[in-house]
C-alpha cells in the first residue's frame, strides 16, 4: 500500500511540475505544443463561463 501511495504522490508532483513549467514558459495554458523530433503533441482547452 505504501508503494501505491508513493506512486500517486510522484504522479501528482510530476503533473504539478509540468503545469508550473508551462505557466513559466507561456502566458496561459489554453494552448500548449510540445515537439520532439517528428512528434508533436498539442493540447487545447476551451471553456465557457456562465
Curated annotation (Swiss-Prot):
Keywords: Cell inner membrane, Cell membrane, Disulfide bond, Membrane, Signal-anchor, Toxin-antitoxin system, Transmembrane, Transmembrane helix. Residues 1-5 are cytoplasmic. GO terms for cellular component: periplasmic space; plasma membrane. Changing residue 30 to S: Prevents dimer formation. It comes from the Bacteria. The chain crosses the membrane at residues 6-24. Residues 25-50 are periplasmic. It holds the Pfam family HOK_GEF. The periplasmic portion confers toxicity; dimerization is not required for toxicity. Homodimer; disulfide-linked. This is Toxic protein HokC. The gene is hokC.
Amino acid at each position: 500500500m505504501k508503494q501505491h501511495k508513493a506512486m500517486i504522490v510522484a504522479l501528482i508532483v510530476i503533473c504539478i511540475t509540468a503545469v508550473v513549467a508551462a505557466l513559466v514558459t507561456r502566458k496561459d495554458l489554453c494552448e500548449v505544443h510540445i515537439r520532439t523530433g517528428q512528434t508533436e503533441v498539442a493540447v487545447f482547452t476551451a471553456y465557457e463561463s456562465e
